[in-house]
């Protein structure tokens, strides 16, 4: 759900903003009542900026869907500066209140209200309490009815209703719900287009039928905030014979804000007897949701995309294969990475499927058996047998290719970069690539060990009792090696947690510190699924600052998006409070 902040300029000196849930609904309302924006400026802004600027002299109000929660920084800002109300969806008010318990104190009381729209009557009493927080559990439809009740039907301008606009409660009873005293006859001066929470609500879904002989649909493609496409496979409708292995989004710059066009290039693979790449599918999408099929041709080094886009005529451009697999110019290009070669001999049945510069193994078990395995930090026997010779960069990069290939196949993979010192250039290069290659981060050896239980609740301890290292330390070492810049490394945070004998692998979308994608693997459970969860925490700079000061009590409160399997069963998906995990490599000292 998009969040639109409509800034209003009144005839008086005061200026206010109100919240509109959906821009399409706003356009419908404007068209229906022949209203005018009167030269309003439309600009995009992030959620933090929107929250900070949606304020008036009396009250600050934030809207959150049932699975989106404010950052601690935003809440503290509201508490210290103004009285505020947080409106959340009907399912998670308890979790919302729990997530704010770190802030609750006698100095900053938190008041909880029910889901009746008449709760705004009570806010008159609330606003006189300084530095307090109100949490309103309100159904989205009720909030919509309340929001639109602020508009009048006067042609020419969008104005706010008088002090006591009539509204409809969820029970159907008419009621009067005064909020702040807005002046009537206020025209729109600008519209700030923001997002609620993080990027998942911004995602658009593109589904296209493949041109293969069996007419199987291509799996769902999701666009995230940073214009990186993640392909999901394994759905009931998708045939296992057709798999999208890479995709990227290309923006076509335009002058008009509403005419933004995005071209999505998908790299598809259809297995046949020869195990060859058979097709590349491309499509484009504009902001109106219309999909345009494009013509394409595949060369040795690039993909040629051409076709007609709305308002632009025939367009043709090239994208390199490094772009197709999501590696940008500022990152390590795949052509600099040594080719992935299996350890030992490989039978004909285990041959790799070559996809340009990307090699995906059909059976990852052959690598696990024949390649040097990671040294578990709590396995003395394996420590004794471990090969303690330094691992060179080529070897580390080979393992990185293996890990990336595993994620492309929607499979679980552990970080196999073991026995490397945190000062080792190979380790630093490996960690850097893990943060940038395909936009995923593979935590090092994320697995439950018996000896971890005693340290499970200690945020100062890593997997083997090793001290926790933060992004700042890794960045400083990478800077010394000239392997990274702050822009590349700052948005990645390592996370670990244990939850009732369930092993999680955590990946973080490139460039978006607020969105975390998890794959859950429960022992004995055959199905794997992804959940999109949001981090209730702090901004990147704030987190780095706390890590730099070794304030390891900085935690992330994670809540499920109640989507996918969890939403289908109408159950809650609780996750544990997590601490920053260890960047330190497992210790590989020989035992006496």
Swiss-Prot record:
Residues 450-469 are annotated as: Disordered. It comes from the Viruses. It is found in: Host cell junction, Host plasmodesma. The keyword Transcription regulation does not apply. GO terms for molecular function: nucleotide binding; RNA binding. Keywords: Host cell junction, Host-virus interaction, Inhibition of host innate immune response by virus, Nucleotide-binding, RNA-binding, Suppressor of RNA silencing, Transport, Viral immunoevasion, Viral movement protein. GO terms for biological process: symbiont-mediated suppression of host innate immune response; transport of virus in host, cell to cell. This is Movement and RNA silencing protein VP6.
